[in-house]
C-alpha cells in the first residue's frame, strides 16, 4: 500500500500553493484534482493583487510560494494601486493572461521535486479514529496519507443560479463535489452556505473600443516576486465604461428574476464585490457604476467586464449590456451567473488551519469562508507547509498578526469566523506600517529559510539584497549635515544645531534620495531598489518605533497559552455571552480571546486568573 506524506485535494489557487509548499519542505506530496488541464485556472476575474491582496501575494512570494512568480510570468497590465498614498497601503496588481497564468502554474508544479499530480474526483475522506488518513475517489480507489489538505473552492455542493435556472456545478461546465460535503457534515462541523458571482464574458471584436476611456499599464511595471528582475510580457490597456440610468431601469424592473432577490439563494455574497443587482438596490441614488473592460489574454478574444457580476436571466443580461456605452452591439460568449457553495466555519480550525476535531486534516481557501485567489493561495501555503511539518514530525509554523497579513487573515478567520466571504484589506491590519509590501521579504524570508521552505536560489538572492542594504545603510548613516550646512544645500530642516544623517534627512517630505545624490555623489552607486527601501524605512521610522511597543504588548498576550481543554463553564465572573463565545472559538492564546467580539477585559482577567491558578496547582 502506497502512502504519501501529504495529499492535497484540489488544483485551484489554494491547492497549488499548498502542494508546492508541502513538497518544498521535503514531504512526499500528491496533488489530486478533477482535471489536470484546469490546474491554476482563474475561475473569475483574470487579475492578481490589489489593495491588501497585493500584500498577501508579496508575502506568499517571500515564503517562496508560487503565485507571485506565476503572476509575473503572465501579467499583461501591471498597475501599482494607491501610488499617491503612503507605501504601507500601496497595492501591486496585474491583469493576467488567463492561458499564460494556467500554463505557468502547471509548469511550476510539474518541475517541483517531491510532487506527484494525478487526476481524480475525490468523493470521501478516510479516518482511523479521530485522525484523517487519506481520501477515496468516485471509483472507490483509496489514497493513503499522513496528512490531507482540502482545497475545494466553490465545488462543495456547488449550485449555479441564473434567473430560474439551477445547475449543480463547481464552476461552469464542471461537476460539484457532493460526497466530500456529506463527509464534512458527517463530522458534525459547523457549516453554512455562501455565494459569489461572475459577469458575462464578451466578444472583444464587438466592443466599440475607440469610444471608451483607456486605462494604460504603468510605464515601469512593479513585479510581485522579489525574484523577478523585470516584466517581459507585453503590456496592454483596458477600457473603462459605466452603466446608465437605462441599465439600472432594466435591472430594477427584473429584480424578481434575479436569483439573489427571488429568495433562491440562501448564502451571503461578498460585501466588497457586489452583484450589479446589489449595486442598483443599495446605491439607488447613483446614476452610474464603473466597469473595467479587461481582455482575458493577448491572444484571447474574450473580455471580462469587471463590476457587473449578475444572476439575472440571459435575455435580461443581454438587454442591460446593450445600454452600456461601447457595448451597444456586444456579443456575449457566456452569460454571468451566481454560484452557491458549502463552507466550514473557520472557527473549527486552529492557527495552522488544521481541524480541531480531526487531526491530520487541513482546510484552505473558499472552504474556509474567504473570497479571492490571493486569500486562497496564502491559506494554501500555510496549510500545505503545516501538513508537511506534521507528517514529518516537526513543529508547526504559525504567523501572528504582527508578522504578516497572512497572520492577520488566519487570526480573523479562526477567532471571529465569517458571516460573508472574507477578503483582505490593509485596514484589517493594526500593524500595517510594519507589514508593508516592500518589506515582506525582510519579514518572512528568514523564517522560510530557517524552516527549509525557501529554495537555495531564493536564499542567495535575499542574502545579496540584505548585504547591499546593510552597506547602503552604513553609508547613509555616516553622511550628515548640520542645519546650516543643510540650508546652504537648499534643504529646510529644524535650526536646532543637530547633525542629521541621510536617513534622518529622508524623513522630511521634500527630501528624496535623488536630491541627496546631488550633495553626496557616492549615494548614486546604490541600486534604485535599495535606495527606495531606505527612503521608505526613513519615512516610517518614527511611527514604527512607537508601533514596536504595541507589538511587544501584543506578543506578551500571544505568549499566554490557553489549554485546549479549558472548561469555561467552570470560570467564575464570565457572562453567558462571553462563556458561549469562548467555548465556540476555543482561542489558543489570551490575545486571541481578546479579539473575540463580546469578550470584555473583565472576562479576560477572569480567564487569566483561572489559568494561572490551574498552572500553579499542576506544579
From Swiss-Prot:
Question: Magnesium: present as a keyword of the record?
Answer: no
What domain of life? Bacteria
Gene Ontology cellular component list: cytosol
- Tell me one GO molecular function of this protein: flavin adenine dinucleotide binding
Q: Does the keyword Cytoplasm apply?
A: yes
Task: Please explain the role this protein plays, according to its UniProt record.
Answer: NAD-binding protein involved in the addition of a carboxymethylaminomethyl (cmnm) group at the wobble position (U34) of certain tRNAs, forming tRNA-cmnm(5)s(2)U34.
Q: Which HAMAP family match?
A: MnmG_GidA (MF_00129)
- Protein name per its UniProtKB record: tRNA uridine 5-carboxymethylaminomethyl modification enzyme MnmG
Which source organism does the UniProt entry give? Maricaulis maris (strain MCS10) (Caulobacter maris)
- Name the encoding gene, please: mnmG
Amino acid at each position: 500500500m502506497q502512502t504519501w506524506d501529504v495529499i492535497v485535494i484540489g488544483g485551484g489557487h489554494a491547492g497549488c500553493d499548498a502542494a508546492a509548499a508541502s513538497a518544498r519542505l521535503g514531504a512526499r506530496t500528491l496533488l489530486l484534482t478533477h482535471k489536470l488541464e484546469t490546474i491554476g485556472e482563474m475561475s473569475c476575474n483574470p487579475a492578481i493583487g490589489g489593495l491588501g491582496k497585493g500584500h498577501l501575494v508579496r508575502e506568499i512570494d517571500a515564503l517562496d510560494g508560487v503565485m507571485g512568480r506565476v503572476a509575473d510570468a503572465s501579467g499583461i497590465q501591471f498597475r501599482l494601486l494607491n501610488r499617491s498614498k503612503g507605501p504601507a497601503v500601496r497595492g501591486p496588481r496585474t491583469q493576467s493572461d488567463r492561458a499564460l497564468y494556467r500554463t505557468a502554474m502547471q509548469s511550476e508544479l510539474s518541475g517541483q521535486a517531491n510532487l506527484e499530480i494525478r487526476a481524480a474526483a475525490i468523493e470521501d475522506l478516510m479516518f482511523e479514529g479521530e485522525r484523517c488518513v487519506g481520501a477515496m475517489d468516485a471509483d472507490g480507489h483509496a489514497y493513503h496519507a499522513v496528512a490531507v489538505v482540502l482545497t475545494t473552492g466553490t465545488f462543495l455542493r456547488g449550485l449555479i443560479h441564473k434567473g430560474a435556472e439551477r445547475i449543480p456545478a463547481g464552476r461552469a461546465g464542471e461537476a460539484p463535489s457532493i460526497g466530500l460535503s456529506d463527509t464534512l457534515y458527517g463530522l458534525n462541523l459547523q457549516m453554512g452556505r455562501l455565494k459569489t458571482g461572475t459577469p458575462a464574458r464578451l466578444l472583444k471584436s464587438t466592443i466599440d473600443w475607440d469610444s471608451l476611456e483607456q486605462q494604460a499599464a504603468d510605464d515601469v511595471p512593479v513585479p510581485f516576486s522579489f525574484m523577478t528582475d523585470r516584466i517581459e510580457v507585453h503590456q496592454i490597456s483596458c477600457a473603462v465604461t459605466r452603466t446608465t440610468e437605462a441599465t439600472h431601469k432594466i435591472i430594477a424592473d427584473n429584480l424578481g428574476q434575479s436569483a439573489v432577490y427571488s429568495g433562491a439563494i440562501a448564502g451571503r455574497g461578498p460585501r466588497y464585490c457586489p452583484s450589479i443587482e446589489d449595486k442598483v438596490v443599495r446605491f439607488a441614488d447613483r446614476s452610474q457604476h464603473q466597469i473595467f473592460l479587461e481582455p482575458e489574454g493577448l491572444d484571447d478574444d474574450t473580455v471580462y467586464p469587471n463590476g457587473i457580476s449578475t444572476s439575472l436571466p440571459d435575455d435580461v443580461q443581454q438587454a442591460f449590456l446593450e445600454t452600456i456605452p461601447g457595448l451597444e452591439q456586444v456579443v456575449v460568449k457566456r452569460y454571468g451567473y451566481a454560484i452557491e457553495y458549502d463552507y466550514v466555519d473557520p472557527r473549527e480550525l486552529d492557527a495552522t488551519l488544521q481541524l480541531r476535531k480531526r487531526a491530520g486534516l487541513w482546510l484552505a481557501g473558499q472552504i474556509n469562508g474567504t473570497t479571492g485567489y490571493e486569500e486562497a493561495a496564502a491559506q494554501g501555503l500555510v496549510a500545505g507547509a503545516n501538513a508537511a511539518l506534521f507528517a514529518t514530525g516537526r513543529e508547526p509554523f504559525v504567523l501572528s498578526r504582527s508578522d504578516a497579513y497572512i497572520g492577520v487573515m488566519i487570526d480573523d478567520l479562526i477567532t471571529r469566523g465569517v458571516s460573508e466571504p472574507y477578503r483582505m484589506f490593509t485596514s484589517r491590519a493594526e500593524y500595517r506600517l510594519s507589514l508593508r509590501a516592500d518589506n515582506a521579504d525582510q519579514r518572512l524570508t528568514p523564517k522560510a529559510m530557517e524552516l527549509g521552505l525557501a529554495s537555495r536560489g531564493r536564499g542567495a538572492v535575499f542574502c545579496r539584497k540584505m548585504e547591499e542594504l546593510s552597506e547602503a545603510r552604513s553609508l547613509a548613516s555616516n553622511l550628515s549635515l548640520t542645519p546650516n550646512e543643510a540650508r546652504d544645500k537648499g534643504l529646510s530642516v529644524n535650526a536646532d544645531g543637530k547633525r542629521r544623517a541621510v536617513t534622518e534627512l529622508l524623513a522630511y517630505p521634500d527630501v528624496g534620495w535623488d536630491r541627496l545624490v546631488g550633495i553626496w555623489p557616492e549615494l548614486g552607486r546604490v541600486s534604485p531598489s535599495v535606495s527606495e527601501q531606505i527612503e521608505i524605512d526613513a519615512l516610517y521610522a518614527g511611527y514604527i518605533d512607537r508601533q514596536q511597543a504595541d507589538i511587544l504588548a501584543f506578543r506578551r498576550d500571544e505568549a499566554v497559552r490557553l489549554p485546549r481543554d479549558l472548561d469555561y463553564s467552570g470560570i467564575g465572573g464570565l457572562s453567558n455571552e462571553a462563556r458561549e463565545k469562548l467555548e465556540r472559538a476555543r482561542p489558543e492564546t489570551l490575545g486571541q480571546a481578546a479579539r473575540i467580539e463580546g469578550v470584555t477585559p473583565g472576562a479576560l482577567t477572569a480567564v487569566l486568573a483561572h489559568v494561572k491558578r490551574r498552572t500553579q496547582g499542576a506544579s
